[in-house]
Amino acid sequence: DIVCYRRWGHNETDEPTFTQPVMYDAVKNHPTTVTLYEQRLLQEGIPAEEVEAIKKKSRDHFEEAYQRFQGGGVEVQFETLKGKWTGFTRINPSEPVTAVAEDELRAVADILTRAPGGFSVHPKIQKLLEGRRAMLAPGGKIDWGMGEALAYGTLLRQGYPIRISGQDVKRGTFSHRHAVLFDVKTDEEYAPLAQTAQKGAHLQIYNSLLSEVAVLGFEFGYSLADPHSLVIWEAQFGDFANGAQVIIDQFICSCEAKWSRMS
């Protein structure tokens, strides 16, 4: 077993002996990790001069950093709008133009509503695909599921990667999405959206584990590292967002003000 302990208090102003005097008396008299390691090296035949040189090198490193800080020679660098984020702006006062040409929509819709040859689509899903294809006919009306799919498809076609995660995102909790089709005979998966990707873009869509805070935390981190991707986390039901509230409050809402980052 490894027994871990804190030698000092919670911070530089904390005094642990106020509340745990007996334990911290034992800690005070216990050799430090450095002392124990030094004794082990000496037992193994490492010359004392070499051991002392290792200790001195570490002390000098920290002392040099401390002196540099004392002299005001340290400039804090933030990654805000630098590196991978170069070219992004803090404020966009006007709505961006997101419209695409009709023939572009039709090309994407054609891909989204067809399965490859030999792929056995569920009969109800086949009917849904046919219904979506009819939405682009004269007089047709596009529903939410098709509108969402067209938005994703046109973004992928323009070269923007898309990443979606959540507890039932492949199908959609209320069966509105069906971004991934399943062969009824083989269980093979097919994602029509992935076929719309161009210019190096790719689609990632994952049914996640049932830990909202863990998944949203990971996806938030992914969004920091890849600003050109559309990264989406979808709560299975509205109140499931409660499980990820700490990420929403501490990182997403306060991302720029608190952490000088954008997402």
Which residue ranges define each predicted feature?
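Flexible, glycine-rich loop/tail regions that form catalytic "lids" or insertion modules at the edges
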Residues: 2-263
